[in-house]
Amino acid sequence: MTDQEQQQLTAAGNEMSASFLAAKKRSDATLAKLEAEPGKFTMLTGDRPTGRLHLGHYFGSIKERVAMQNRGVNTNIIIADYQVITDRDTTEHIQDNVLNLVLDYMAAGIDPTKTMMFTHSAVPAENQLLLPFLSLVTEAELHRNPTVKSEMEASGHALTGLLLTYPVHQACDILFC
């Protein structure tokens, strides 16, 4: 750690930790590389089609997705229609929600000529990766996942085993893109 970083760390009222400063330094370096050569980067993001998007979605992530797309970053957006059934009682509105999600993305500035948008259900090969991936993790590991644990606690009702596969499905998403 440099003297300047140490002074920043110990300055009165400064609550940043050394690990935060190191992470910020790495983030700043990555951002500089992104600005210089955006085409060397790939962004993978997505949403579950559970309803219409709102301002929170826009300011929380979609605005930045549009900016990254317009910088020239290879942009992939998953519409995680299979993941909706992990914690929902019905699949009745999924098709309408997928269509509305795409329309909302486009209205917010996502350009389908610059960004690949796809649903899980449209890519059988991605879902076929799920079985061999599941053979690499134990049931106990799936139950220890903090996101899965909080979803189970928050649901208030019994959930299907599909929720346990959610993080493994996300690993398949990453390999696909």
Model-derived features with residue positions:
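NTP-dependent nucleotidyl-transfer catalytic core
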Residues: 1-177
